[in-house]
Each structure stands twice: as C-alpha cells, then as structure tokens.
C-alpha cells in the first residue's frame, strides 16, 4: 500500500518542472518528510540543489529542515524555494 501526495510547487521549482503541482507516491511506512524530499531528488535531479535550500510546508506550516515528520495523503504539502528580488 502507498500514499499519494500532491505537492504544490513555487518559484524556481515550478519553472524547472513546468507544473504548478505534482503527485508523488510513497509506501505507507515511508511517508515522512525526509523520504518525500529524497524521492523528489531522485525523480527530479534537476531541482536537487534547489531542494537543499527550500522550505517544506505541511498544512501551511513550515517544517524545519532537520525535522522528519510523518505526512498523510490529505496533507497540503508545498515546496517553497528561496525567493530573491530587488
């Protein structure tokens, strides 16, 4: 069995992948934030370095990069890359 996660994409990640959102499957026993990022890096190596400096938001709350949390298929998950401007 697995969970399917909808991941909302923003800024550079959205530009590189070319979509507003993607779907990722993870086994039930591996449905954590660390495993999600690991799988994203594997599927989309072109955003790997951006993911290293991006924030992960689960249900509109930022998750610390060193915090591995359990995620559920009904959670709202977003990848928030750093934004630069001038």
UniProtKB/Swiss-Prot annotation:
The modification 1-thioglycine is found at residue 86. One of its GO terms (molecular function) is molybdopterin synthase activity. The keyword Nucleotide-binding applies. Pfam families: ThiS (PF02597). SUPFAM superfamilies: MoaD/ThiS. It comes from the Eukaryota. Its main location: cytoplasm. Pathway: Cofactor biosynthesis; molybdopterin biosynthesis. GO terms for biological process: Mo-molybdopterin cofactor biosynthetic process. The keyword Phosphoprotein applies. C-terminal thiocarboxylation occurs in 2 steps, it is first acyl-adenylated (-COAMP) via the hesA/moeB/thiF part of mocs3, then thiocarboxylated (-COSH) via the rhodanese domain of mocs3. It is found in: Cytoplasm. One of its GO terms (cellular component) is molybdopterin synthase complex. Keywords: Cytoplasm, Molybdenum cofactor biosynthesis, Nucleotide-binding, Phosphoprotein. Gene3D superfamilies: 3.10.20.30. InterPro entries: Beta-grasp_dom_sf, MOCS2A, MOCS2A_euk, Mopterin_synth/thiamin_S_b, ThiS/MoaD-like. The modification Glycyl adenylate is found at residue 86. Acts as a sulfur carrier required for molybdopterin biosynthesis. Component of the molybdopterin synthase complex that catalyzes the conversion of precursor Z into molybdopterin by mediating the incorporation of 2 sulfur atoms into precursor Z to generate a dithiolene group. In the complex, serves as sulfur donor by being thiocarboxylated (-COSH) at its C-terminus by mocs3. After interaction with mocs2l, the sulfur is then transferred to precursor Z to form molybdopterin. Belongs to the MoaD family. MOCS2A subfamily. Heterotetramer; composed of 2 small (mocs2s) and 2 large (mocs2l) subunits. This is Molybdopterin synthase sulfur carrier subunit. It comes from Dictyostelium discoideum (Social amoeba). The gene is mocs2s.
